[in-house]
């Protein structure tokens, strides 16, 4: 098949307008390959809006002169002035020059005869095709209209018309190809037959055939026509689809060739983009009698995608059979931002094509990717055909270049030509039409002609591709002994290059300059080698060819070399610098001076230099590093658990490393032996023994030796500060990893785990362990009590809980438990609890379960109340001015006992358990317990005692389900001394009137007695004699001896 036009035919004007309204989006960034975008051949012709470039073709003229031409259709071009026609369309031929405006209009003489045919707006140039070297040219006008008359009424038939011209683009009347009418449609029929067939919407040549597409035939079902010439015989073929439906557009695009479904016979491939609304491609073969028979139909997969609007044939995998590419420019995937597709069907050795594509290429949304597709030949001369795909509505238009291989078309484009980067003012819809497969500048590489709707065509010429066929990189010596290095050289590297042209042109001997970069130890920082005369491990150089050249470079070892085990990798990469034009000049610039390296070749080479090592004859060290590790105490005792508290400050880790020979491993030197420790944030490196063996950053690195010798042993003792253990810490994990640059494949990381038992530290204290109180007054029963003051004297205990330093945060609860003396042994109330309040970061009541606090619901007193003084209490118990029962008193003759003790441990009191949770708080928490002495119990049962002492216990403990958190219980005692204030009984008081009466009666009685004595002469004075007699008698009485004296005198 010749290099005919390979753009998708564009028939109706309405369709063209719709395409122009599409918005470009997306993009693809691909490194350029060998289509040159600097030295473009750009042509502009026609009047503005002529659509110059709507169709394009490359043509080689060999008659009358030797030259290459760029053919471009301008279907909206103005007519040659004749006074009757305004617009007909045109075809321009453009020479291969550096000028933009030297195109000539092709001479196709069409006379205007409105009575028989209409050439106004016939779209001449909608199709342009070349038969190849020394071949003819085909030009079509699909809107050419014939006029039929029925009486005075005319009927118009848009049958279309195609013109064949000679190799020199002139009419040769002796050539049957050119003089044949090529009128395949019958204008005497209507649109239901071929009266509106629009012949020439697509068309092309082979060596002995010319073919046309007519998508308007049979109510726009469409048809395909072919004229075949064999020597003097001429045969016409056509295809009428048996399906009874219109609007399929068969013939919208056509390609004809062999090695499709038969190695010799030709196969017609025609697109029908509206077949069943999803589009299809028909494969037809010749039948006797001039018919084309349908052999296979490939259907599209999406409604409205216009599958089949562009097709191309190319042997992608070099199996000798032509493969098929089908464009679907309106294909879309909304979620993936895809717009346009190319379906690739690989030929199954001439039997058929698979129903589903082997590859589906996508373009960006709104790009119309696949609106044009063309086989452009082997542009890089790698032996495989290449493909160009147009995306005219992506920005200002783009053309994607795909290469192929033995497996078919490569998925990723090798080059993307961006219309906006070409620097052409007014350019748009770049890539609307494509034509290739011809080397127009004769440099052995086919070129590509690209058309647009903006009155521009652009020729992209292929640059020569250079293969580097001989590249060597040889170090000397290959095994380096640092002891043999000199001040000027340790390693010498020799590198050599040679090239050829991929097209195999033996005359191509251009002087090219190859830039190369050598880098020593690229994967290591810092590198171990540097180039002589420099401190750098990188060297940049240039080679000038075509003759093979070699170069030698000297390298030196860096100072303080540590790694002498791993080889030094010396890498080389090279490139061909972009050469800028020497100076402006007239004429078309040859691209032979601007070659490009073959991108399919590896542009990098490397070699390595080994170190001389004491590791056996193979120079390969096989170490046997082994390690034991454990957490230990300061007495070197192994720890399985860490009993942590805030007093713990240090933790020790003992590590033993050996490198000894075993039956399985030789235990040779371990180069760059390193121990890496990954420790949790709770541990901070404090010290290492031996000193300086380890360095800490986020990870701890301990250098064991370089090398760590055979049979060497080493012990490390690492001390850590424990700084971050919390209640959430269940364990401490340390990962230990031995590493060496020697060969050892069993160096697995060791995970060392130390369980942590966290011991909370807090305190429990009291403001006053022992309180003073009293009892006395009257006995009152429960039913008579209304307020807590009716119970008895108040008590107030204050407990203080020290802060833990760290909140439990849901891991447990700190609880204050009280062993509270609640009753005496006979069940009577003892100390009646009225209220418990917790004060920390706030204040709230504590309500232990069991309704043990103020169970009688008595009215609480003012929180500010304090116990009354004994004097005040005595006055309150004074019955003189009050009412009610008299206070209980002690018998005046009875003396009370001194003291008794009530405690639950002796059974003389019964206790209940009260619990109050202590909140997480960084401050001291106060727990206040208020109670009342049950006065009646003490009056009834302990009235005989001066003092009753009641004892209780308080315990602070931790309640948690986590076994690693614990706390030592804190216990304290509390008590109250309750003194008796009962008074002794007093004598009964006598009424005043009785006293007055008694006094009066006494005085009266005394008077009577005196009177009586007086009457009896008691008050009369005695005589002198009687007086003296009395005195003498008294004296006699005084002088009488006593009985004792008398008894004494008897002896």
UniProtKB/Swiss-Prot annotation:
Location of the region described as Interaction with HPS5 in the Swiss-Prot/TrEMBL record: 1015-1021
tRNA processing among keywords: no
Binding site for Ca(2+) 2: 378, 380, 382, 386
Subunit structure: Heterodimer of an alpha and a beta subunit. The alpha subunit is composed of a heavy and a light chain linked by a disulfide bond. Alpha-3 associates with beta-1. Interacts with HPS5. Interacts with FAP (seprase); the interaction occurs at the cell surface of invadopodia membrane in a collagen-dependent manner.
Disorder association: Epidermolysis bullosa, junctional 7, with interstitial lung disease and nephrotic syndrome: A form of epidermolysis bullosa, a genodermatosis characterized by recurrent blistering, fragility of the skin and mucosal epithelia, and erosions caused by minor mechanical trauma. JEB7 is an autosomal recessive form associated with congenital nephrotic syndrome and interstitial lung disease. The respiratory and renal features predominate, and lung involvement accounts for the lethal course of the disease.
PANTHER family: INTEGRIN ALPHA, INTEGRIN ALPHA-3
UniProt-recorded name of the protein: Integrin alpha-3
Species this chain originates from: Homo sapiens
